[in-house]
Amino acid sequence: MAAGFRTNVWDPVLIISQIIAIQCTFYISLGVWVLIVDYWSGSIHSLDQFFAYKELDISSLKGKLLMIAFCLNSLTGAMALWFIVKRAKQCLDFTTTAHIVHLVFCCIYAGFPFSWTWWLLNIICLALMAVIGEFVCMKTELKAIKVSAGSSGKNSV
């Protein structure tokens, strides 16, 4: 195989570690945003806010603030993609994986989410995280690469 620019090498350890890092960042940042929402709304802290679809109630202030926390978490997740994955081509893959793992955790914790609000919110958050992550990664990938012209001066042969 000829050497080329950014050759792809199958590295399952790297991929799994990136998935774990993105998932941890996803839940840590969601925890921070939910903590801020709880402070504003005066709610008690609960895992239900992460995993129970019934908490995402559009008619209550608490539910609306929780939805905002999920959307803000998408922005934080996009920055995590930029920092951890660094490839625009892989942002959708890692974002989808994070949200599918979140769906599995929600199903284990509170059962299958039958609320259209939960599905709509998670699809919007997935799209936000993927698109913004791809944008910031692409801006980094498209930066000019500085190439030195070589040595000049007295020590040249």
Swiss-Prot record:
Example GO biological process: Golgi to endosome transport
InterPro entries: Integral_membrane_SYS1, Integral_membrane_SYS1-rel
Topology of this chain in the membrane: Multi-pass membrane protein
Annotated Gene Ontology cellular component terms: cytosol; Golgi membrane; trans-Golgi network
Compartments, as annotated in UniProt: Golgi apparatus membrane
PANTHER family (UniProt xref): PROTEIN SYS1 HOMOLOG, SYS1
Protein name: Protein SYS1 homolog
